[in-house]
Amino acid sequence: MSVAFTSLGMFSRRTNWDRQPNRLTELLEARRAAGQPVFDLTISNPTELGIDYPERELLAALSNPQALRYRPEPRGLLSAREVICRYYREKELCVDPSNVFLTAGTSESYSLIFKLLCNAGEGVLVPRPSYPLFDYLAQVNDVKLRHYHLRCYDSEWRLDIDRESAEGAKAVVIVNPHNPTGAFLKRPEHQEIVGVAKENGPALIVDEVFLDYPLAQDDRRFGSTAGDAEALTFTLNGLSKLAGLPQMKLGWIVVSGPPPLAAEAMARLEILCDTYLSVNSPVQVALPPLMKTGGRVRSQILQRVKSNYETLRKATLNSPCSVLNVEGGWYAVLRAPQTKSDEEWAIRLLEKAGIYVYPGYFFDFDEHKYLVVSLLPNEQAFASSVQSLVAIVEQNCQTE
């Protein structure tokens, strides 16, 4: 191959990522290559964690002969969209099937909405801390990210959005409950955000993939934004978390808002979806039984998350490493002693005991004192790893 074809100038700037592994990743790869044990407290794939999936029912759902027919519907098959509307009816929300757009997962949902709303270089407001995926999605869609903050007061996270920060943004992204802090959107926060949208004009993109994983009841929570008519709103969800089926690659967008805005958004979004037609027929045909069995899978996952959170909470009592309040989702945030940075603590845990956790900077925390762990691992392995984690932190604090 000639030099011209191997030149970096061949490729777009949007894909010019820093692909060098960080120190933690290098240590993790070296440990695995050497055959040393790794106790992964970041794992979030429920299909590999001993969850009891109803295999016979799931496989039967995927063997429907109707899946052999191809019907290119930009919004997705009506039968599948009606199932999604029933899901919202169970939450006492009225959603019309015409307002539902099927996608090949939440990442594609974001990409479609960014394309719908943003010209190149325009901004979208996202939370900080937040999931690292936003950076990649913004870059490949030529969107600039701006940030509002989640701030922690008395172990509870609260949104801090003001009109000045939202000015000029084409959309505000809300993750409800937030990942990784687990903070649910509260009613006063929702009203504040709607007020910002009405005054400054940004659309609302509300990611609800963890909505059905509350760890406790709280009457302050707003619930789902599906069907909200006060501001142009795109509500996202999908099978990956809702049914514990990430391999099925089915997500959806519910469009709502003032009728003229919502109608224009849906007309344009339909053409975008028609351009890709990315959702496969078998999963659309199988959606009714997948949603039904998904409820049983979700119950198991929620039970495990609650159990592991309680284990973590008890293990960190009277410890220099404390766990912040978790309201929902699959993750927990630990506040580590400031004798080391978050990355230094993560490296220490991996070197000493093979325990792999996320340093908070992976999620763009403002302060480098947080560690993030998944609440999905097997309960016994999780409890053992957490005990070792706490012991290492305590021992380190005593010697420094």
Task: Identify the meaning behind each predicted range.
Residues 288, 303-313, 323-336, 367:
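Conserved glycine-rich beta-strand-loop-beta hairpin in the small C-terminal domain of fold type I
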Residues 227-306, 314, 392-394:
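Conserved core segment of the aminotransferase class I/II
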Residues 126, 147, 206, 357-359:
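Hydrophobic residues in well-ordered beta-strands that form the structural core
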Residues 86, 94, 348-357, 363-400:
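PLP-dependent enzyme catalytic core of the Aspartate aminotransferase-like
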Residues 2-105, 112, 160, 278, ...:
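N-terminal small-domain helix-loop-helix segment of the aminotransferase-like
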Residues 34, 141, 199-200, 319, ...:
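Helix C-cap/helix->beta junction micro-motif
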Residues 67-199, 211-227, 234, 387-388, ...:
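Conserved core of the PLP fold type I
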